[in-house]
Amino acid sequence: MKKFFAALLAAVMMLALAACGGDSGKTVDVQKLADDLKDNVPYSTNMIASAVEDLEYKLDPPEGTAIAGYIADGSAYDMIVVAQCANTDDAKTLYANTQTYLDDLKREANLYQPGEEARLDGALLRQSGAVVVLCVSDDTAAATAIVEGYLK
């Protein structure tokens, strides 16, 4: 009887620990994916590396998020943001923050650069597991194909 209860207790503890672990899903190299998007997707202008601090300020990612990205070197709204969060819940939070940032950019573009608003509307914003990707480019389909390759 003692062995049965010991085995039952061990099983319950393992289930409890597994439930607390969170689901991080697929892990990606954020810099590699950002570089791949920069090198293989057309943009309206040259792309320059964005300081991580700038992205963190704009997107307010949860603690423990690895983030990389590029921005347009001119007045265009082209951008790449790739983030690997600690878990799916953090990724959902970052996705919502990124959507808010994208909506703010759309309002700004509507006032100052109406032509850019349509590009922002067609942007790739994707969350899969603990990964969040934003890509504003001239070819959303090409960006989507690259991202899907990393998330398989």
Language-model-derived ranges and their functions:
Residues 15-19:
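C-terminal motif of bacterial Sec signal peptides marking the signal peptidase cleavage site
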Residues 21-24:
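Bacterial signal peptide processing site
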Residues 46-77, 89, 120-121:
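Short, compositionally biased low-complexity segments enriched in polar/charged residues
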Residues 71-103:
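Mature extracytoplasmic domains of secretory-pathway proteins
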Residues 115-152:
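A short, solvent-exposed beta-edge/loop patch
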